Amino acid sequence: MKTLKGYAYDARTVEALQAVNEPGVYQFFGMRGIGKRIAAEIVAEKMLGSRLSANPDYLMISPKEKNKVIGIDDIEDLFVFTGQMAANASYKVCVIDDADLLTESAQNALLKLLEEQAGQVVIILVAHRHLIDTVESRAKLIPFYSLQREEMKEVIDDLDPLVAELSGGRIGFYKSMVASNGYVQTVKNALKFIENGNKADLFDCLHVIREKDKASFYETYDLPLIRAFVSFLRQVFYKILLGASGIEFGFTPGIDVSKASEHYSILSIQAAVSVLSNAERMISDGRFNKNDWFDMLRFIAE
């Protein structure tokens, strides 16, 4: 692990970031919450030699809140920006955050700009998922890696092993989980329910199962946090399945998996793994809604 202006990153990522020193297209690629946007701003500031605030040579493009996409209008703004001479630096720098939310037409327009402006501008694409091949082929890929738990301990005091596991080694995601009202306790209570085979625990911690409160949990926690919760539950049930089958497995923070395996049949565990895996796919495809969330919880609680 190394730090970049006080932020912790995998050593391989820091080495690649320090090598960004000339115009071109760079794609910062990795899971959400791993620090890509912050790294992009650090690199942009280094290349411009001055602060980004009110800097005429810097442009940040991100999804419009209403549509949650980056459209062709945004790329037209980028054409205007790159078509003007740099005011204070040798070149201009643009960061496109959530670049994987560029529409196909916007990506094609971006491709045209990359062909015309090669060597004259720095464009950093911050992406959690892949872009179209023709755009990616023109970018220098800089992968971002998650940190090991021991590395996280170096930068987070009193590291919670359960949250570290949930976050997948992403410092930013870890902090989001801790800051989200009641999220960590919700997960811990759910694990307690699974360990004891007691429905009441889950119903108490997820009171939204009651019809009158049906929207609360889903509106309180954004989709990445819910996906992490679902993914972790799938891993827990998979380890319960291994234990019930007599196969040894590693330690899982927050739950005694051996104890939990006493409360479930192998068929019910297999069904839970299947339901949770399907929920993960639906979240990835953008098809997961509140009804799916509650149907999933009811299935696991039965």
What residue spans do the PLM features occupy?
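Charged, glycine-rich active-site and insertion segments that engage polyanionic ligands
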Residues: 1-49, 120-121, 127-232, 236-302
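Clamp-loader machinery-focused feature within the broader ASCE/P-loop NTPase space
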Residues: 1-105, 112
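Conserved SAM-binding loop
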Residues: 95, 124-125
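Short, surface-exposed loop and linker segments with low hydrophobicity and enrichment for Pro/Ser/Thr
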Residues: 102, 111-114, 220, 224
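Conserved catalytic/switch belt of AAA+ P-loop NTPases
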Residues: 108-124
